[in-house]
Amino acid sequence: MSEKVEKEIGEQITKLDLSEYRSIELSKLSKENIGQKIRTFGWVANVRSQSTITFIELYAHYRTVKCVYQKKMHLTMCTSMTVYGTVSKNFGKKDAHEFEIQVEGVEIYNGAIAPSFPLNEDSSVNAILTNGHLGLRTKKRQLFLKARGHLLKIIRDFYFEGEYTEVTPPTMVQTQVEGGSTLFKLDYYGEDAYLTQSSQLYLETVVPASHRAYCIMPSYRAEKSRTRRHLSEYTHVEAEMADIDLDGLISSIEALVSYSMRRFYEEMKSDILSVFPEFEFHKVPRTPFKRIKYSEAIELLKSKGYKKEDNTDFELGDDIPDAAERYLVEVVGDGCPVFLTHFLVGHKPFYMRKDENDKGLTESTDLLFPGIGEILGGSMRQDTYEDLIEGFRRENINIDPYYWYLDMARFGPCKHGGYGLGFERFLMGLMRYESVDEATLYPRKVSRCQP
């Protein structure tokens, strides 16, 4: 800003009786304020100057308001400023604003115009994430922020209505849940400790007291996977329930997913369409969802001629990769979520309960979501001391750090089960993001630990 313009702006403010201007948050302004003198604060989202007039789109709290200043000003995106003016009818014919502010004075915060903004709506995802602190000023990332917060609230509402107790288990642990090779190790006052892979074991200890418990906590996996759906740190939605069987567990998952999808799309629809006018909303699935056993899925893939990456047939014992999972969603679920159930004992962790009719299988399930694949894993939990000891031995795990977990099988055990939902994957699916990075505030993965 030139010294002359800066001086003119300053002089204009001094001529105003600021006590006449009512302070109102920008997001709370409406056409009900027409005729009122107001003061409001925000950031410049867009600016256009003509010879003697400046049109400013001022942004704050997910809301943009049109401001008209009868002076030519040089402003840049993200400049923070306070506007004094009168709310009036919108006289523009080419925009959808219900009202506008006829500006009578402005105060640039600290008198500093922001530098030229390095991003725009066409910037790549990588560029936006590399400049993540500034990327949040773009419309797409602002929508992400609102969508993320909204989905978290919806999930918590589901659990609150279902009388689940929320807890916050520790994230520094000396146990493992999903295999030692994916642990982040740290020095805990001279002892080995790890960042948690899952809060499941601690959640199980809460169940005898609360009957139903959940947590929404960070989990960590030191997996060097470079895929569009893997993170090294992610938000883990986990729940455990007492006195339940596998069918009941799956029904509870269906209820969570259907409830969340329905409310999310109902309440976020206008926000999503304002940024993505052509957005295709997923069908909210009817319950029960389609189910297919792991062994049946292997046979289906073989019968359909769906090959592995090395162009050989799938065989019992093979992992089903994400591309094949997405294929199963289309073929089995007709584009709606599908439960993949009854995985082999040797392919699942020590804590999963064996199927009573086939001890080679677990009472387990993964939920496959359209466009992504697996977003949730769950199972009935082992509840006998002997079966837990067998599981520890099978996986060559030292039982000493698990003394407290083994006590659960000695002091009033019950039939119980639970699951863990990858929150970012769920949001990625709902928003049709190409990568889980887009569903994450500041992604942490093999290739990224900044900003």
Swiss-Prot record:
InterPro entries registered for this protein in UniProt: Aa-tRNA-synt_II, aa-tRNA-synth_II, aa-tRNA-synth_II/BPL/LPL, Asn-tRNA-ligase, Asp/Asn-tRNA-synth_IIb, NA-bd_OB-fold
GO biological process terms on file: asparaginyl-tRNA aminoacylation
Chemical reaction(s) catalysed: tRNA(Asn) + L-asparagine + ATP = L-asparaginyl-tRNA(Asn) + AMP + diphosphate + H(+)
GO molecular function annotations of the record: asparagine-tRNA ligase activity; ATP binding
E.C. numbers: 6.1.1.22
Pfam family, one: tRNA-synt_2
Chief localization: cytoplasm
Top-level lineage group: Eukaryota
Record's keyword terms, sorted: Aminoacyl-tRNA synthetase, ATP-binding, Cytoplasm, Ligase, Nucleotide-binding, Protein biosynthesis
Top EC class for this record: ligase
Compartments it resides in: Cytoplasm
Gene Ontology CC entries for this record: cytoplasm
Family to which the UniProt record says this protein belongs: Belongs to the class-II aminoacyl-tRNA synthetase family.
NCBIfam families per the UniProt record, alphabetical: asnS
Protein name: Probable asparagine--tRNA ligase, cytoplasmic
Native source organism of the sequence: Encephalitozoon cuniculi (strain GB-M1)
